[in-house]
């Protein structure tokens, strides 16, 4: 917006003015969604039978004064290894985690393990057109803790399905805090929640294990990954974990060489209760976190992580709210609501009973006499 104003009008808007405008514009964000939940302001659409909840964390570069205490201390104690840039793997310690959440409904899309493997192949077989997420709402917050955002996600889901007639699922990446919060919220709301581990995270572990067995660039690694992925999709994750460990032992790999294999096996065993992909595929559930990954990219990475950016807490929260409204398709409705609230604050609040008097009608003006004279 600032760039558009500058290019079209030749006016430069100061940064602080933009931040203040964003804070004022986003001040009714929570009230807007609270009203929707309490009054069911927006009619719940007839949507697919699967109701998905998903959340993730994404770091935002902050001013040092706005970092959490532990992160600020780590930033102050950090000793840079290089003078002008960070070395590989070195962290800046300047980020504060935001929590990103998404709630949507979707139609079932049943698939087979073989179809998934072929779809993930470099030259993949095109599947039938998959259903798109419906009535998707995404949002992010850096001020509120993860438990508050998970609660908001369940409140949004409850608004859409108050009688719990849909199938509730949660797509996760394996973060233990997130898993604990989801289970607790499901218990509080009395809903049966199916938790599904993101398949792409599983695939990343498989590829790391594959390179422990194969030389770099060896095409046999693709077949190795495909075979084990198919078995995991058939619901045999524990057998895959045991098999790759046994293979590493028979090959006599050292502790360092087999570390990626053990990490993959540990991952599969730790989360095996969320790896029943055979059931998920048969019921047509989504098995990847593409929606929340896209939300993290749009809401946080594309705007908040631009080169040199350092955010204040209030400024970051304001921009996250506005981008969330735009991404969810709620901005126009929110803006009408925000203008109503501004009218109440700036006008109705100043008069008794909120009755703003009508302006006095303008006095009628007499028609001016013509200055032209008839000359005979």
Pin down the residues of each PLM region.
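Catalytic center-proximal scaffold of phosphoryl-transfer enzymes
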Residues: 1-376
